[in-house]
Amino acid sequence: MSYSVTLTGPGPWGFRLQGGKDFNMPLTISRITPGSKAAQSQLSQGDLVVAIDGVNTDTMTHLEAQNKIKSASYNLSLTLQKSKRPIPISTTAPPVQTPLPVIPHQKDPALDTNGSLVAPSPSPEARASPGTPGTPELRPTFSPAFSRPSAFSSLAEASDPGPPRASLRAKTSPEGARDLLGPKALPGSSQPRQYNNPIGLYSAETLREMAQMYQMSLRGKASGVGLPGGSLPIKDLAVDSASPVYQAVIKSQNKPEDEADEWARRSSNLQSRSFRILAQMTGTEFMQDPDEEALRRSSTPIEHAPVCTSQATTPLLPASAQPPAAASPSAASPPLATAAAHTAIASASTTAPASSPADSPRPQASSYSPAVAASSAPATHTSYSEGPAAPAPKPRVVTTASIRPSVYQPVPASTYSPSPGANYSPTPYTPSPAPAYTPSPAPAYTPSPVPTYTPSPAPAYTPSPAPNYNPAPSVAYSGGPAEPASRPPWVTDDSFSQKFAPGKSTTSISKQTLPRGGPAYTPAGPQVPPLARGTVQRAERFPASSRTPLCGHCNNVIRGPFLVAMGRSWHPEEFTCAYCKTSLADVCFVEEQNNVYCERCYEQFFAPLCAKCNTKIMGEVMHALRQTWHTTCFVCAACKKPFGNSLFHMEDGEPYCEKDYINLFSTKCHGCDFPVEAGDKFIEALGHTWHDTCFICAVCHVNLEGQPFYSKKDRPLCKKHAHTINL
């Protein structure tokens, strides 16, 4: 429902906005100041602002709406729409009028809850004696809502009083207890009592139970039964034999001794599923998840006992299978009824069992001893050995050294069929990967084949090496020697001392570093300083001598006279023009695009045109103004000197050097005689141009920019020195 409100100005208006187009939500009133103009105009919080001074707010941002309200001249007209927000529902439950008793130690018995007087308390003779139970006298005093028995009261009779009740016992006397047994209250009172809480901490039943327990403590002190000092009896332990936890404890205690030991061994050796997956990834899954028979066999051999067990851990095994004697009576006791439990507690029996059923699994934890864990670990390795154990020298055949020739050298299949086939016997390989990988690969790769196998660089970079290099690796890696892998090479190889004598060196190493023949001469040659494009060069003749250079064209040794050009040597008959094949021995040539040309061919095909004389440029070329010039054609229009690599200025389409351009065309300052360059501040006065810092008084040198001045003999003067005679 829309409605319009007009607020009389001026501001403040007394409301706050929220939302807008930039917040992707409509403009709403978020807050109204109490007593303000907005509150007096019946604006409600949460109403939607549809229009401000007749302007729709659908396209307004939050800032635009604020500015629109601020710009209101005198009155502010708002078109609002009632919020569709539902009425908040209270989440708290309505208060329940329940009758609560009067608190005896905080309420005067002569006053009611609302302060009205009640009947006076009866005489002390009418009160109940300490020996009689106070329950019949309390029942007609309280309302029916509190007269019914509850489970809390029955349990409170059998429970041990806590510290609050002990403090009550210390502070009250027997006479005070008799007063508590007969409190005064209005019968049938239904008004709520003061200082109470939902759990009934100060209810009548709680006070009655406290008084009854205090009476029982006094009777126990008088009869001499119970603990010394008149304290309350200790509660007997109530065992719920029907609970699943109790049944599981009894079942674990009644297990036979061998089954308990077997469970302890399995719990100490088995691993979780994540450890089994990790073992499969690392290749050690043969050690995981053993069956029960293997575990039983691992603990039965006698030869492992003296190695792994100790005197401190041996007595733990027989003791772990026996349940504690103190826990067995409580475990076998039948469930007690509720009435029997109260009777046993009322008699103040102190013969409760010393241990609870929760202590029964404790000896099971001691069944795991280092003896079992240590003896089962080595037995796991021996239980999986199917057949005779492989000796230490045998695994030497399964090494990287025996497999390398098949990867690097394409030796025929007949070479590997006789000897390595016999060495790859299933004895060390088939049982498990453990015995095959026990020797480290480092000592297996150090025997004599390592220094003798010295291939040339060609097989290392080509997938198929030359056939003449095959015999060397095949001899070095043919078969596996029967010697153990742990023995050093100077023991297994008889010629080790001759090979590695201090004064000897192998020739195979020199073959690796030195090539068989000289490398092919590439046309690159030594680096020559680069020349400018189009530079005319000439070859230099050299007579025959002891020097034997290589020709830059045919890459052959030159016998006899030769030419030297562009940093290389040439046969005289092979140093020709790339186009007309004319010999360049006695004529000039030009290098262009990695080729040499005679002057005539270069002028015809490659030489650029000069922009001034319109002829071919042979030699150094000047590039300026996006054109090519002879160095002698591109000169200053005033002094006719070539520019070279210096700066020049253009004026009326002609180039000028910097000196002539300043003298001819630049504006000079009349004060300092220096040119006024572009970007400099200048002043035009007295028919001349001045720098802004040069237009000063000729006498006192005060800057006259923007100031009145006088002139005398074409020089500016300030007002103070205007009548100066001598200048």
Curated annotation (Swiss-Prot):
Tissue expression profile of the protein: Expressed primarily in skeletal muscle and to a lesser extent in heart. Also detected in brain and placenta.
Keywords (A to Z) from UniProt: Cardiomyopathy, Cell projection, Cytoplasm, Cytoskeleton, Disease variant, LIM domain, Metal-binding, Methylation, Myofibrillar myopathy, Phosphoprotein, Repeat, Zinc
Region: Disordered, residue numbers: 86-197, 284-440, 472-529
Residue ranges annotated for the PDZ domain, each copy included: 1-84
SMART domains xrefs: LIM (SM00132), PDZ (SM00228), ZM (SM00735)
GO biological process, one term: actin cytoskeleton organization
Compositional bias segments (type: Low complexity): 140-156, 312-385
Domain of life: Eukaryota
Domain LIM zinc-binding: from-to ranges: 549-607, 608-667, 668-727
One Pfam family hit: PDZ
Post-translational modification Omega-N-methylarginine, affected residues: 219, 516, 533
SUPFAM superfamilies in the cross-refs: Glucocorticoid receptor-like (DNA-binding domain), PDZ domain-like
Compositional bias of kind Polar residues: 188-197, 494-513
GO molecular function: actin binding; cytoskeletal protein binding; metal ion binding; muscle alpha-actinin binding; protein kinase C binding
Pro residues composition-biased segments: 428-440
Gene3D superfamilies tied to this protein: 2.30.42.10, Cysteine Rich Protein
Principal location class: cytoplasm
InterPro entries registered for this protein in UniProt: PDLI1-4/Zasp-like_mid (IPR031847), PDZ (IPR001478), PDZ-LIM_domain (IPR050604), PDZ_sf (IPR036034), Zasp-like_motif (IPR006643), Znf_LIM (IPR001781)
GO CC field: adherens junction; cytoskeleton; filamentous actin; perinuclear region of cytoplasm; pseudopodium; stress fiber; Z disc
Subcellular location: Cytoplasm, Perinuclear region; Cell projection, Pseudopodium; Cytoplasm, Cytoskeleton; Cytoplasm, Myofibril, Sarcomere, Z line
Associated clinical condition: Cardiomyopathy, dilated, 1C, with or without left ventricular non-compaction: A disorder characterized by ventricular dilation and impaired systolic function, resulting in congestive heart failure and arrhythmia. Patients are at risk of premature death. Cardiomyopathy dilated type 1C is associated with left ventricular non-compaction in some patients. Left ventricular non-compaction is characterized by numerous prominent trabeculations and deep intertrabecular recesses in hypertrophied and hypokinetic segments of the left ventricle.
Main function: May function as an adapter in striated muscle to couple protein kinase C-mediated signaling via its LIM domains to the cytoskeleton.
Assembly with partners or alone: Interacts via its LIM domains with various PKC isoforms. Interacts via its PDZ domain with the ACTN2 C-terminal region. Interacts with MYOZ1, MYOZ2 and MYOZ3.
Name of this protein: LIM domain-binding protein 3
Species of origin: Homo sapiens
